[in-house]
Structures are given as C-alpha cells and as structure tokens.
C-alpha cells in the first residue's frame, strides 16, 4: 500500500525489525475489500500483502496512513479528532467484515469506508489503540469494518456523507445557468450568494424528503429579506441539483393531494428555517413576488389603528411565516363569498337623544359597514391576530386623538375612512332600535365568516387550520369585552351574545369536521363495516322500539323504514358523502309535514331529541352484547348526531328567514328561554289570568324575571 506524502510527522513507511526470540512463520495475510455493490456470486477482490516479519514487543508509533479493523460496538471518531499509537500482535488472524459505512460512491459502484482513529477501548484483536488528544464524537458504532486511516493533508475533516459538488463543478453550474437563463455576467455573484444560502441551511440525508415548493418558498423568503432578485422555480431546481449531486424527486402524498418532494435532503438542525416548520403536514406554499403588499389593509377598510407604532408594526410583518402558511390554507376556505347588504335601521317613532341626529345614524351605517368589511377581509386572509386591533380601534376612538375620529362623513359616497368617537358610539347604542340593527348586522357578518372559514363541514382540512380556527373562537369574547370596556352593560351583553354564538358555531363545525375525518377511515374499512353489520343484525330492534315508543311516540313504520335503510346503506359500504345524503333525506322526510308551519322549529327540535334517544338505545344494546364494533358505532353515532344538528339548524334558519347564527343565538342566553316561547301551543286558553301569570313566571328564569320587573325584590325571587 502507498502512504500519504504530506505530513511532516508521518513516516513514509514503517520499519519492522525481527524480535530477539524466534517465532513461527506467519502466513500471508489477506485483506478483503470492505464494501461494494458487487452482485452475489461474483468472487470478491482480494489484496494480497507480503509476509510480515515478527516484531519485538516494544511499541511502534504509527501515524495516519494505515489500515485498521474495528470490532462491532467499538466507537470510531472523526478524522483528526484523535491521535493514537498502536501495538501490533504478530499472531496470524484473518478478519471478514460484515458491513461498512458509505463515505462516497464512485462511478463503478464501489464504496470505500474512511475513518480516522481507534476506539478508546481495547478490542479483542491484536491492534491496540492508545488514545491521546481525544476530541470529537463517534462516527462508526455498528458491526465490524475495515477503516482506512489518514489523508493527503493530515488535517481534520468530517466524514459525513455530503455528496456536495466540488468548487469547479459549482463554477461550471453557474456558467451553465447564466447561459441557459440568459443571465447577465454580473449576476454570477448573486448566484454565488444563493449557493451559499443553500449550503448554510440544507444538507443531504438518506431516507428523508422535503417538499419542493417549501424549499423554493424558503428561498423566496430569503431573497425578500435580503432584497435579492430570485430566479424562477425551474432555475432554482437546477441550482439545487448542481449543489447536491444525486438528488432525486418523488411525488408523495395522498391521491389528489400529492406534492413533489426532493428525496435525500433536509434542513440542517441549526438552520433558522426550522422555526418556519410549524405545520406537521406538507406546507406547499404559494409562490409570491418579493414586492407583494401586506394583505391587511387597515387604512382602506378598517380605520387607522390609533397610534402610529401599532400601525407600523403591522406593516413590518414580523410573523411572515404565519402569513405564508395562511396563504397555503386559503385554498380550503371560500374567499369568493359575497358579503350581503345590511338592512336599514328601523327607528319608527323612537325619539333620539339630543346629542344624536339622523346624520349620526347615517354615519354609523357607513362606518359600521366599512368596519365589518375590514373584519371580513382580515378573516379571509386568515390574519386572526388583527381582529382585536380592529375592534379596539373602532370602539375606542377618542375625539381628540385624530381628525378622522372627530369628523363625520358628509355623505355615503365620501371615500374618507372615518371613525366615530367613543362618546358618540355610546350615545347611538343606547337607542334600542340602533342596538337591534347592529345585532342583525352582526348576525349577517358572523354567518358570512362561518361560511368563509368552513364552506364544507365534511371536507378534509389541515389540522393546523382547524386548530387556528378554534384558537380564534376561544379568543373572540375576551377581545370584544376588552374593546368595549366603558360601554353600557346592555350593549356589551348584546354584542357578546352574538359573538358567543359565532364562537360556539366555529367550535361545533370544527369538531364536526374532525369527526368526519375520523369516521371516513372507518367507513372505508371493509372488515370494520362487515363487523358492524354483523353486530347490528344481532340488535333486538323490537325491544328498542318498545322501550322508546312511550317516550318518543314515533310511528312504528317510520322507525322500521329508517332501520332498513340504515342497514342497506351500511351493507353497500357507502362513502361519507353518501351517508350525508341519506341523513339529509331523513331530515326532509320527517320535517316535510311541518313545512311552512309556525311549529316547524319545535318539530325540528323534537326530531333531534328523538333521534338522539333512539341512537342511544341502540348503542346501549350493543354495549350489553359486548359488540366488537362498539367503538366504530360510537364514532359513527357521534358524527351522525352532530351532522343532524347541523342539518336541522340550517332547515330552521331557512324556514324562519334567519341566519343559522341568529337561530342558535336566540337560545344562547338562558334569559331568552321561556315556557311561552318554547311551548306556546301547550298552554290552554281556558286558564285564568292568574294561572297564566304564574305559568309565565315559572317558565322564566330568575334572571329574566328580575330584569323584567325591577321592583321585584330579590328575596321574593
């Protein structure tokens, strides 16, 4: 073997002297090539070494440029990280390695294992390493392998498999890109900076992949931050392949939602880009130009944000990663939803306060419409964090803080965005018709927001978007209460009641969506469906009907038809969309006889109660029989109950001409519940007036009776 020529302290050869005492002759030693991709059956190449004379027992100091065998389990450290001295045992031994680590691949397919040092422990063979100047971390700790020590320069270097191109190859790649893309010669330095960014943030690694669009969007972000002109996606792909040789492309993901991935590359653990990886799913982000304007438009839509510091911070976009992720999520929402017009306030014969004029009412209509449009615009861009600032700026504008707050628009066509002072808003909201008009506008706004964020409750959406919506819903009430501090309690209760119904709707719809995704997997599993059908056929539905008939008083023929249809739909292994269509038909059949009747809302509520009672009886029977598919039935039952609620909610809203938010918000506050509203038809006309009063009193909650009769003493309640 040839030794390296560099290194002043590395001798060109090792002189071996015979020992004083004779020793048996040693046969020739054979080194088997450690690794290679040679097909099975092909004889392995052997390297025959001349016979070695025995050596005296003294230690010979051997420096890099040698071959060493390392047993499995022994640690190996990076080249140059340790200096070692070895003692050689002349006993004839032959080692056959079982595996070897790959350092680089040659065109011929052979693999060479390069290492640098001996382990600190004493291996079982005759090569004993005496460790000195230990530094670094082990690089080989698997099964035994031959390690070729030393290098041309004797310097320390990493043994990691990088597969990076040489500087000459990179220069050729830059020249090729300049010619193919028609780039000016002075942009060679720009490409060099792009290459350096790639080398600083990415590394090759086997068995991992990275979405191609994510890598390109990281690059766009880098160019935007450093005011660089980016190359297009195709040129960027050529640039990557010139840096990381042998990079492969794969299409990964579910059918219909697959993305191209670079296979064999990953972010470095210390790269700042790791902070952008907030989503566990694939973040195939949209490409955007570096000069894109902020999507939030506070000046045009929402009024100024009070002080200039808050305004500038919002334009600074410190959380651009969140904005980029939001752009990816926008494909799951309905950004084309049309915002309905608001009704005009019905003042009737209401007398306005002296400080409020009709001009103030018209100004409120214009300003509140613009405020709601700004809210919709922010939500469409999934910039939920700006909602609190919008509400604060609208409800807490001081008359002396800016000219926009002090002045009012002269006409509806006035393009100037203005805010009403807080004192003026309080005076306007004290007028009951104005407050009810604002409540109706909120119903329209929040229903539009719901249909924008969750256009289809059964459609799969990323879990990160679902969680963002739930966090948004959790914060709404606190944001509004904080923004409206100082307003009359009645105004706050009215506003918070509507926003509470909005938040509850978001929570219900996201939970329904989560159940739908979990149930979709069950409905697509043939073995689970067969087990469910087998367990369902063992249920004694006659006994279920007998127990439930007294409570629900349903027609037996209707119950039997629903049972038969359910089993048939289950046997056909229907998809989730087909089940949704079946549930919709059930609601239509049951509520058809009440269509156009004032009792439609009550009939819809009764149907929900009966459906839930029957399904609970079936689940009870499955539980008592220890059905194997109980878990699947429980999940399906939860989904169908929630979806029935969703369908009935929309049917009632359609029948009453209200929005679903208004329907659910009607009974959100316990004070609005009364026996008179819920069961008017159950109260007979023959009751005396005193009994009628007692019935109303008993039907009303204590809070409402106290509010309706201020003179009523608390002790009497």
UniProtKB/Swiss-Prot annotation:
Q: Which residues carry the record's DNA-binding region feature?
A: 194-269
**InterPro entries cross-referenced by the UniProt entry:** DNA-bd_RFX (IPR003150), RFX-like (IPR039779), RFX1_trans_act (IPR007668), WH-like_DNA-bd_sf (IPR036388), WH_DNA-bd_sf (IPR036390)
**Subcellular localization, as worded in the UniProt entry:** Nucleus; Cytoplasm
Give the originating organism: Mus musculus
Q: Which GO terms describe its biological process?
A: acrosome assembly; cellular response to leukemia inhibitory factor; cilium assembly; positive regulation of transcription by RNA polymerase II; regulation of transcription by RNA polymerase II; spermatid development
Disulfide-bonded cysteines:
none
Q: Where is the composition biased (Basic and acidic residues)?
A: 685-710
- Protein name according to UniProt: DNA-binding protein RFX2
Molecular function (Gene Ontology), one example: DNA-binding transcription factor activity
Its GO CC terms are: cytoplasm; nucleus
Where do the segments described as Disordered lie? 1-28, 286-318, 685-717
The entry sums up its family as follows: Belongs to the RFX family.
Starting at the broadest rank, the lineage of the source organism is:
Eukaryota, Metazoa, Chordata, Craniata, Vertebrata
* Matches recorded under Pfam families: BCD_RFX, RFX1_trans_act, RFX_DNA_binding
Q: Which residues form a coiled coil?
A: none
As for what it does, the entry says: Transcription factor that acts as a key regulator of spermatogenesis. Acts by regulating expression of genes required for the haploid phase during spermiogenesis, such as genes required for cilium assembly and function. Recognizes and binds the X-box, a regulatory motif with DNA sequence 5'-GTNRCC(0-3N)RGYAAC-3' present on promoters. Probably activates transcription of the testis-specific histone gene H1-6.
Q: Which PANTHER family match?
A: DNA-BINDING PROTEIN RFX2, RFX TRANSCRIPTION FACTOR FAMILY
- Residues bearing Phosphoserine are 26, 411
Gene3D superfamilies, sorted: Winged helix-like DNA-binding domain superfamily/Winged helix DNA-binding domain (1.10.10.10)
Listed A to Z, the keywords are: Cilium biogenesis/degradation, Cytoplasm, Differentiation, DNA-binding, Nucleus, Phosphoprotein, Spermatogenesis, Transcription, Transcription regulation
Q: What happens when the gene is disrupted?
A: Mice are perfectly viable but show complete male sterility. Spermatogenesis proceeds normally through meiosis. However, haploid cells undergo a complete arrest in spermatid development before spermatid elongation. Arrested cells show altered Golgi apparatus organization, leading to a deficit in the generation of a spreading acrosomal cap from proacrosomal vesicles and merge to form giant multinucleated cells released to the epididymis. Spermatids also completely fail to form the flagellar axoneme.
Subunit and partners: Homodimer; probably only forms homodimers in testis. Heterodimer; heterodimerizes with RFX1 and RFX3.
């Amino acid at each position: 073997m040839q030794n390296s020529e560099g290194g002043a302290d590395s001798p060109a050869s090792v002189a071996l002297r015979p020992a004083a005492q004779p020793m048996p002759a040693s046969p020739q030693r054979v080194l088997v090539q450690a690794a290679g991709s040679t097909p099975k059956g092909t004889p392995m190449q052997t390297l025959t070494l001349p016979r070695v004379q025995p050596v005296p027992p003294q230690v010979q100091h051997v420096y890099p440029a040698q071959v060493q065998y390392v047993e499995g389990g022994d640690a190996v450290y990076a080249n140059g990280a340790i200096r070692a001295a070895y003692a050689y045992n002349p006993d004839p031994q032959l080692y056959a390695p079982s595996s070897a680590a790959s350092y680089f691949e040659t065109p011929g397919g052979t693999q060479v294992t390069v290492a640098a040092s001996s382990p600190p422990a004493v291996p079982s063979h005759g090569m004993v390493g005496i460790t000195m100047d230990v530094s670094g971390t082990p690089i080989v700790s698997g099964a035994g392998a031959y390690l070729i020590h030393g290098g041309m320069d004797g310097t320390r270097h990493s043994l990691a498999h990088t597969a990076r191109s040489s500087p000459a190859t990179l220069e050729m790649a830059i020249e090729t890109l300049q010619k193919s893309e028609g780039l000016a010669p002075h942009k060679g330095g720009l490409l060099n900076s792009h290459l350096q960014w790639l080398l600083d943030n990415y590394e090759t690694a086997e068995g991992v992949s990275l979405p191609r669009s994510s890598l390109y969007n990281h690059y766009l972000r880098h160019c935007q931050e450093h005011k660089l002109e980016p190359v297009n996606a195709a040129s960027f792909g050529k640039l990557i392949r010139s840096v990381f040789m042998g990079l492969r492309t794969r299409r990964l993901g579910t059918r219909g939602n697959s993305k191209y991935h670079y296979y064999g590359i990953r972010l470095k653990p210390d790269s700042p880009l790791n902070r952008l990886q907030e989503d566990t799913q694939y973040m195939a982000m949209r490409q955007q130009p570096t000069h894109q304007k902020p999507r939030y438009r506070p000046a045009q839509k929402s009024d100024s944000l009070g002080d200039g510091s808050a305004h500038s911070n919002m334009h600074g976009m410190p959380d651009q990663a969140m904005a980029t992720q939001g752009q990816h999520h926008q494909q799951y929402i309905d950004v084309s939803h049309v915002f309905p017009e608001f009704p005009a306030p019905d003042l009737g014969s209401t007398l306005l306060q002296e400080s409020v004029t009709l001009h103030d009412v018209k100004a409120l209509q214009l300003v509140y419409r613009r405020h709601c449009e700004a809210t919709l615009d922010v939500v469409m861009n999934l910039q939920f964090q700006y909602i609190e600032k919008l509400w604060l700026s609208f409800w807490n504008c001081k008359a002396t803080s800016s000219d926009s707050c002090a002045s009012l628009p002269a006409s509806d066509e006035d393009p100037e965005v203005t805010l009403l002072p807080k004192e003026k808003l309080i005076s306007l909201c004290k007028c009951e018709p104005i407050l009810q008009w604002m409540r109706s506008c909120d119903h329209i706004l929040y229903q539009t927001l719901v249909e924008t964020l969750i256009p289809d409750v059964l459609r799969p959406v990323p879990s990160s978007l679902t969680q963002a919506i739930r966090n948004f819903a959790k914060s709404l009430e606190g944001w509004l209460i904080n923004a409206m501090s100082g307003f009359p309690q009645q105004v706050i209760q009215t506003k918070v009641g509507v926003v509470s119904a909005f938040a509850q709707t978001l929570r219900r719809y996201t939970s329904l969506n989560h159940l739908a995704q979990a149930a979709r997997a069950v409905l697509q599993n043939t073995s689970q469906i067969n087990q469910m059908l087998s367990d369902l056929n063992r249920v004694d539905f006659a006994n279920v009907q007998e127990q439930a008939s007294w409570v629900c008083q349903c027609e037996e023929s209707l119950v039997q038809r629903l049972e038969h249809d359910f089993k048939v739909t289950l046997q056909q292994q229907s998809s989730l969309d087909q089940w949704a269509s079946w549930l919709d038909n059930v609601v239509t059949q049951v509520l058809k006889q009440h269509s156009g009747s004032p009792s439609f809302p009550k009939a819809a509520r009764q149907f929900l109660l009966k459906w839930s009672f029957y399904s609970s009886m079936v689940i009870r029977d499955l539980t008592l029989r220890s059905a194997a598919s109980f878990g699947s039935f429980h999940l399906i039952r939860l989904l169908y109950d929630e979806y029935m609620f969703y369908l009935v909610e929309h049917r009632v809203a359609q029948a009453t001409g209200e929005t679903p938010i208004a329907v659910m918000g009607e009974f959100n506050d316990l004070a609005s519940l009364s026996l008179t509203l819920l069961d008017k038809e159950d109260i007979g006309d023959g009751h005396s007036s005193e009994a009628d009063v007692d019935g109303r009193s008993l039907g009303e909650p204590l809070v409402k009776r106290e509010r309706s009769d201020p003179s009523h003493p608390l002790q009497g309640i």
